[in-house]
A protein has these predicted regions:
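Conserved core segment of the aminotransferase class I/II
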Residues: 3, 220-221, 225-296, 300, ...
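N-terminal small-domain helix-loop-helix segment of the aminotransferase-like
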Residues: 3-99, 106, 281-283
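Conserved PLP-anchoring active-site segment centered on the Schiff-base-forming lysine
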Residues: 110-132
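A short helix-loop-beta submotif of the ANL/AMP-binding
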Residues: 134-140
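A short helix->loop->beta-strand "cap" motif at the edges of active sites that frequently abuts
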Residues: 137, 194-197, 225-226
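Active-site phosphate-binding strand-loop segment of PLP-dependent enzymes
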Residues: 144-213
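PLP-dependent enzyme catalytic core of the Aspartate aminotransferase-like
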Residues: 157-158, 340-349, 355-386
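Conserved glycine-rich beta-strand-loop-beta hairpin in the small C-terminal domain of fold type I
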Residues: 278, 294-303, 313-326, 360
């Protein structure tokens, strides 16, 4: 018998600490302005905080129902009908989760079997691929090209096979800041209608959409929503990322499978937070209705402040992120450039290549503008010096 520690064989040997954690740590080390990780430097609504304190004081501190507090699921159903013309069933279609990340993981785990192929659009959020791998799935990536990152539907159709089980899309899209229109959902339906393929629509930034047409949701498409999971996040909507409360909307047969996973991941979600969110949704719908203008102003502050810089600004149709091309500044790759930018100029950003599996030849970085005006102006002043 030896004293050597027993080391498990990794199921995810290629993964280390996420770039978001790395860049935030580097920003803290160098006291840099952190435009890397997508969290605000301002607080959420006072009313929401007051309702949380109220429900805690009232003793709502025990387990919530596994599917979510009834009042919150009812408020979600009402909001969904108001925005997308579809009212999901409160009992069978809506599941409250520990953040959108849990909803994504539970949905992927419920739908993907060993050997199934899952189509993702690169650049893509980094939580998709590990969840697919843990379920034995195979990621099939379709690269979207800057500056507009639109889907080539002929190339998409060519990716489909008898093994395709799932398509994961994200709109508004992190990190490219582009949005889908209803024409995109129509094209998706045309491509998969004859196949047994499910859809996960990651819509955590649904309320941060600057398109004149407003947010296009999979839930507004009658055929697609019968085989789709829509995922959303209260943390993004109410500037409370630390609360980690999200939800998913799906047809009853899909929801039933998602809940089988959910009940053994977290079982239930923070009770007083759910009750407070239900109160907020009912009492102040103007908050989420005003979010496009709120974040448009922040986007424009940063864009205008960078106009005199050597950074090329890409179109931003949604999310709280802005892509910039630094080709005129440096020949470094994007990871090295972000590290240098944090150390030497005191601004932390995210390299776009980390959202892609294949080599990414473009010199693009992502800036988060979910910040106070003073933070954005201070960061822009440093970036103009490049």
């Amino acid at each position: 018998m030896t004293n050597n520690p027993l080391i498990p064989q990794s199921k995810l040997p290629q993964l280390g600490t996420t770039i978001f954690t790395q860049m935030s740590a580097l920003a803290q080390q160098h006291q840099a302005i952190n435009l890397s990780q997508g969290f605000p430097d301002f607080d959420g609504p006072r009313y929401l905080q007051e309702r949380l304190a109220y429900h805690v004081a009232q003793g709502a501190n025990q387990y919530a129902p596994m599917t979510g507090v009834q009042a919150l699921r009812e408020a979600i159903a009402q909001k969904t009908e108001r925005l997308y013309g579809y009212q999901p069933d409160v009992d069978s279609n809506i599941t409250v989760t520990a953040g959108a990340t849990e909803a994504l993981y539970a949905a992927i785990t419920a739908l993907v079997r060993n050997g199934d192929e899952v189509i993702c659009f690169d650049p893509s959020y980094d939580s998709y691929a590990p969840a697919i791998a843990l379920s034995g799935g195979i990621v099939k990536r379709m690269a979207l090209q800057p500056p507009h990152f639109r889907v080539d539907w002929q190339k998409f159709a060519a990716l489909l096979s008898e093994r395709t089980r799932l398509v994961i899309l994200n709109t508004p899209h992190n990190p490219s800041a582009t949005v889908w229109q209803q024409t995109d959902f129509a094209a998706l339906w045309q491509a998969i209608a004859g196949h047994e393929i499910f859809v996960i629509s990651d819509e955590v930034y649904e309320h941060i959409n600057f398109s004149q047409q407003g947010h296009a949701s999979v839930l507004a498409h009658p055929q697609l929503r019968e085989r789709a999971v829509a995922v959303s996040s209260f943390g993004k909507t109410y500037h409370m990322t630390g609360w980690k409360v999200g939800y998913c909307v799906a047809p009853a047969p899909i929801s039933a499978e998602i809940r089988k996973v959910h009940q053994y991941l977290t079982f239930s979600v923070n009770t007083p937070a759910q009750l407070a969110l239900a109160d907020m949704l009912r009492a102040e719908p103007e908050h989420y209705l005003a979010l496009p203008d709120f974040y448009r102003q922040k986007r424009d502050i940063l864009v205008n402040a960078l106009n005199e810089s050597r950074l090329e600004i890409l179109p931003c149709e949604g999310t709280c992120f802005l892509l910039v091309d630094y080709s005129a500044v440096s020949t470094m790759d994007d990871v090295e450039f972000c590290q240098w930018l944090t150390r030497e100029h005191g601004v932390a950003a995210i390299p776009l290549s980390v959202f892609c599996a294949d080599p990414f030849p473009h010199k693009l970085i992502r800036l988060c503008f979910a910040k106070k005006e003073s933070t954005l102006l201070a960061a822009a002043e440093r970036l103009r010096q490049l």
